[in-house]
Amino acid sequence: MIQILGKTNIDFLGKKYIALALSCIMIILGIFAIFQIHAGKANLGVDFAGGLSLQIRFSQPVTLAEVRTVLDKAGIKDADIQELPTEKKILIKLKKQQEGIQDTIEKALKENLTAKEPIIESVTEIGPKIGERTKRDALFAILAATAGILIYIAIRFKFHFSIGATVATFHDVMAVLGIFYILDKEINLIFISALLTIAGYSLTDTVVVFDRIRENLGKVAKGTMTLEALMNKSINEVLSRTIVTSLTTLMAAVALFFFGGEVLHDFALAMILGILVGTYSSIFVASPVVLLLGKNSLIKR
């Protein structure tokens, strides 16, 4: 493992109350965002808000930028454009079903991309009921992932460790959701996929710290060290590894943000935020929660 830091002795848990206060603010912000989403006051994508979906086939490859330019000229600026598995097909999603919008899109594409022979293959209306069901399914997916984390950590470690990991994961998901709400970013299925990916990343980061804590618990002689001191020691020991892992993953997410195209832009942004928040929570949220649930007494074996 690459070492970018020497031996450190930082009192991370000495700052636990400040960190937990900051984390509570982020969680509250995320919960507020959930209520706003439920009330339909957030920037919801077509999958959640309902709208119109058009699948268009071309005779030649077409870029999203070309289609975006054509739609902008036609006054359609809020369309969500996605590439399909074949480079000759695209998907256009619109939140609002304006009268004659399908004809407007077809006319604009045929006039500006005549050589590529655009043809609307299918049109799907996404009604409010489908949007509500999608919201419920997305919430269920997040809750199921959280429950899985709780069970996995409880089996691998101890129950209070599972609470710490679950709180840290919940914290990360709520923080990213809250930030996206503040930035007025679109909440869609791609974003939900990012949240589930963040949950998995957060768990991996936390398990690295917990694994070192468990390892050190087996090495420390009875009555020679408090649990807080042992946790600080463990976090410092894996700090370099945590930073290297986070930076490596972050570089990939940043590259995706700048070069991944329009469709993956918000996914990459969510991942960048999730990596930063997840690294923070594995140090300042998961371990302090475990410490607060247990007793900061001399270790007994």
From Swiss-Prot:
Keyword Ion transport in record: no
Keywords, in A-Z order: Cell inner membrane, Cell membrane, Membrane, Protein transport, Translocation, Transmembrane, Transmembrane helix, Transport
Cellular localization per UniProt: Cell inner membrane
A GO cellular-component term linked to this record: plasma membrane
Gene Ontology molecular function terms on file: protein-transporting ATPase activity
A GO BP entry: protein transport by the Sec complex
HAMAP family recorded: SecF_B
Family the UniProt entry places it in: Belongs to the SecD/SecF family. SecF subfamily.
Subunit structure: Forms a complex with SecD. Part of the essential Sec protein translocation apparatus which comprises SecA, SecYEG and auxiliary proteins SecDF. Other proteins may also be involved.
Protein name: Protein translocase subunit SecF
Protein's organism: Thermodesulfovibrio yellowstonii (strain ATCC 51303 / DSM 11347 / YP87)
